[in-house]
Regions:
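Positively charged, small/polar-rich N-terminal and surface patches that mediate targeting and assembly
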Residues: 1-139
Length: 139
């Protein structure tokens, strides 16, 4: 799967105890749907503690209940992320969703010297931090 250099990072903030239907955790439903729609990848991050709109503390409790904060990150082309947003709207009842621009440096197998060339090209343009079109061709 090819991921463009300029991409969008989608972050979904929810809780470990949030559900999609009766059985499936919401974070699993989101990851499975992202996979089904051939998005580049998804990662679930569990935090030890957090709070959201309600200001209620979310955390793992000693006696098995897990209300830990969960963040799902998905990075892909803007068009693919935009196509995924209606799915989230359908399956999520609450939570926070953010989007931000991302520059993909590596995806899949590493090409020899790629990161070093990118670092050098960014080092030569410290004021704007971007790689011009001539340098992109060399990457």
């Amino acid at each position: 799967m090819e991921v463009p250099h300029e991409a969008v990072l989608l972050r979904i903030f929810t809780g470990a105890d949030d559900r999609c239907g009766v059985e499936q955790p919401l974070y699993m439903a989101i990851v499975m749907k992202a996979r089904e729609m051939h998005l580049a990848g998804a990662t679930v991050l569990k935090g030890p503690v957090g709070f959201g709109q309600s200001s209620r503390m979310h955390q793992r409790h000693f006696f098995g209940a897990d209300d830990s904060p969960v963040v799902i990150e998905i990075c892909d082309a803007e068009e693919k992320i935009n196509a995924f947003l209606p799915v989230l709207d359908e399956i999520m009842e609450s939570g926070l969703i953010t989007l931000e621009k991302a520059r993909v440096l590596q995806y899949g197998h590493k090409r020899s010297g790629y990161l070093e060339r990118l670092k050098n090209s960014l080092h030569h343009h410290p004021h704007h931090g971007s790689v011009d079109s001539r340098e992109k061709q060399n990457l």
